[in-house]
A protein has these predicted regions:
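Helix-to-loop junction immediately C-terminal to a conserved catalytic motif
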Residues: 53
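Short coil-to-helix segment of the ABC ATPase nucleotide-binding domain corresponding to the Q-loop/switch region
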Residues: 97-106
Length: 235
C-alpha cells in the first residue's frame, strides 16, 4: 500500500448477515481522490459504504481504511475509525429540536470537545466552508433541503476526517441544488480528503467527471474514463 493510499480492499466479500452481496472486491483509493459508486438499488453500494464504516463486519478478505485494518478491527477501535470518516446520507438526520449550531455542538461534545471557544471556532469554520456562516441560529425546518444537506456536510467535517463517505447525498434535491452540493464535495476532495459517493444521478456523474466503480451482478467493476453511456449504466 503506497503512502497516498487511504482505502484498500483485497479479495474482499461483502455480506449482509449471511447474504453475499459483493465478492472478489479489489480496489485502492488515494488521498484527494473522488470516486463514484454506481449500480442498481440493492447492488451493494450502501453495503460497501457500511463496511468501510465498520457498520457491517468484513468477514472475508482484507481491507484497510484510514490506517485501520477492517478484517481485524476490535469493537473498541471502531469509534476511533469513525472519527476519521465523515458520513453524508440522503436523509439529513438532523436533530429537529435543535438549531444548526446546537446540532454541530452535540457532535463535537459527543466526540470529546469540551472547550467552548474551540467548539465555537470549529462550528464557525465548517459553516463557512459550506456557505452557511450566517445560518447557525436557524432550526432545521427553517432551512431548504439544500441548506440542510450543507449542514450535514459541515457536520461531517467537524473532526477533520480523512475520508468522506456520501450515500446518495443529492437524492432528495433539485438539479441546481445538487450541483451546489457537488461543488462542495469536489472542493473537499481537492483539499486532500478522499470522497466516496454512491449515486444514481448520472447527469451529475457526467457533469462532474471522476473515477467510477459499478456494483453489478455481485462484483465491483471499474469503468473506463470515457464518455459515459447512460443507457449502458442503466442496464
Amino acid at each position: 500500500m503506497s503512502f497516498d493510499t487511504i482505502i484498500q480492499f483485497e479479495n474482499a466479500s461483502i455480506f449482509i448477515h449471511d447474504h453475499l452481496v459483493l465478492k472478489e472486491v479489489n480496489f485502492t483509493i488515494n488521498k484527494s481522490e473522488f470516486v463514484y459508486l454506481i449500480g442498481k438499488v440493492g447492488s451493494g453500494k450502501t453495503s460497501l459504504i457500511k463496511t468501510m464504516n465498520a457498520e457491517l463486519p468484513l468477514l472475508e478478505g482484507e481491507a484497510t481504511i484510514a490506517g485501520f485494518i477492517l478484517h481485524h478491527i476490535k469493537p473498541r477501535q471502531i469509534p476511533y475509525l469513525r472519527r476519521k470518516l465523515g458520513i453524508v446520507f440522503q436523509d439529513f438526520q438532523l436533530l429537529i429540536d435543535r438549531s444548526v449550531n446546537e446540532n454541530l455542538m452535540f457532535v463535537l461534545k459527543a466526540t470529546g470537545w469540551n472547550n467552548k471557544k474551540d467548539i465555537d471556532r470549529r462550528i464557525s469554520e465548517v459553516l463557512e466552508k459550506v456557505g452557511l456562516q450566517h445560518k447557525g441560529y436557524k432550526m432545521p425546518h427553517q432551512l431548504s433541503g439544500g441548506e440542510q444537506q450543507r449542514v450535514v456536510i459541515a457536520r461531517a467535517l467537524l473532526n477533520d476526517p480523512e475520508i468522506i463517505l456520501a450515500d446518495e447525498p443529492t437524492g432528495n434535491l433539485d438539479p441546481e441544488t445538487s450541483e451546489g452540493i457537488m461543488n462542495i464535495l469536489s472542493e473537499i476532495s481537492q483539499s486532500g480528503r478522499a470522497v466516496v459517493m454512491a449515486t444514481h444521478n448520472y447527469n451529475l456523474l457526467n457533469k462532474f467527471r471522476a473515477r467510477t466503480m459499478k456494483c453489478q451482478e455481485g462484483r465491483l467493476i471499474e469503468l473506463e474514463n470515457r464518455e459515459i453511456d447512460f443507457a449502458a449504466l442503466e442496464e
